[in-house]
Amino acid sequence: MDVKTLKGFKDYLPKDSLIRIHIVKQIFSVLNSYNFDLIDTPVLEYSELLLKKSGDESEKQIYRFKDHGGRDVSMRFDLTIPFARFVATNISDLKFPFRRSQFGKVFRGENSQKGRYREFMQFDFDIVGEDGFRADAEILSVVYYGLEEIFLNFIEGINKKFIIHYSHLGILNSFFEKLGIKEESIFILRNIDKIDKIGIDKVKEALLLKIEKEAVDSILSLVNLQGAFKDKIQALKSILGDNESVKRVEDVYRHLSLLKIQDSFNLNLKISGGLDYYTGIVFESEVFGSNMGSVCSGGRYDNLVSSYSSSIQKVSGVGGSFGVDRIKDIIDLEQFSYIKIFVTKARSKVLIVNLDSALQNYYYELATRFRNHDYSKVKNISCEVYFKNKNGKNIKEQIEYALNKEIRFLVFVGQEEYKENKIKVRDLTKKEELLLSFEEVINVIKCNEKLLCTPF
């Protein structure tokens, strides 16, 4: 029997899972600060629903089959289309504007490689029921603060590790209309989106199959606008005149400037979202030096929800998706090893060393006190008792176990400590050992949470 995993699918060992949880927790903390509400949707949906707005590329990659009841079903390839179905299904129970967050696995039958899998986790966030520019800007600010939290850019001395590219499909569509080729807009956008992947020459070659050379040259010149934001806006105004989409981009930029985060954003007209349901702002996020593609992308989709129900009026939406597993692969790169140090040191885990067979019950009572010392459960300490007791003759074995699990604190209680109601605690990162009361041990562990601010 072949016991290896399928191509594009993988197991996650504890250390890998720890990094994934770090990513999810950091994103969740940001979304929670913005009042996003967590939801969930099924992994399986009717194929007709998923294929309706997926685009040709996604249709080729979808896992589709007949279930035991003969129904044509597919595994979700993203979380956005199932969310649009969710809104259409539950619209009477939702209060708009609705801020949604959701994380879960999605499935795509694409060529697997580093940073690209057939099963992977996404963390999505959306605002539906609001079509103003501030909703666009708020989504972009979530991307910024989410990546800042993940890559610890809030710590002094750690430089920004990412750039967020954004565009507006209305700008491109206005230009196509001016050139008299609006009917080919989907074809053009799909190819423009591939410029950074396959190169401008191959994209030009593909565009020339349907578009005149003069128009192709004009398009490629537009999407390669260079300079500062104000220079690009000035160029767009000279080409398109008074244009609503250009004004929208200006308004979004002003909002980002209000937050003093505008320097992490780049107006990049090569970005088109890659999916047919986008209608306005679109964005992708790049981590410097990773060469793994976008780690968070999304955009505005004003017609998606209403396409699933004839009784629903237009429900505007804008959102994005963090690629949890791709971000995890980037953190595996050597230049991001500081994050692993941070995550490991931030875990105040305890191992109670099993020294004395006569103190077995006490050890488990003590472990319960560590786990439950904080009534809110928020700041409780992860703790376990080493199972095997050899009356102190296997201490080396227990320390090796702690090191392997990256447990930071060892607790020793022998007969002498027990009689004095004291605990001996050893910090494995400092090779430091102290004899303390239970309350003092808690304080020592909690004081070491300062490492959350200085992980080195």
UniProtKB/Swiss-Prot annotation:
InterPro entries, per the entry: aa-tRNA-synth_II, aa-tRNA-synth_II/BPL/LPL, Anticodon-bd, Anticodon-bd_dom_sf, His-tRNA-ligase, HisRS-like_core, HisRS/HisZ, HisRS_anticodon
- Keywords, in A-Z order: Aminoacyl-tRNA synthetase, ATP-binding, Cytoplasm, Ligase, Nucleotide-binding, Protein biosynthesis
Q: Which Gene3D superfamilies match?
A: Anticodon-binding domain, Bira Bifunctional Protein, Domain 2
Q: SUPFAM superfamilies attached here?
A: Class II aaRS ABD-related (SSF52954), Class II aaRS and biotin synthetases (SSF55681)
Per UniProt, the enzyme's principal EC class comes to ligase
Q: What NCBIfam families would the database entry show?
A: hisS (TIGR00442)
The entry's protein name is: Histidine--tRNA ligase
Q: Which species? A: Borrelia garinii subsp. bavariensis (strain ATCC BAA-2496 / DSM 23469 / PBi)
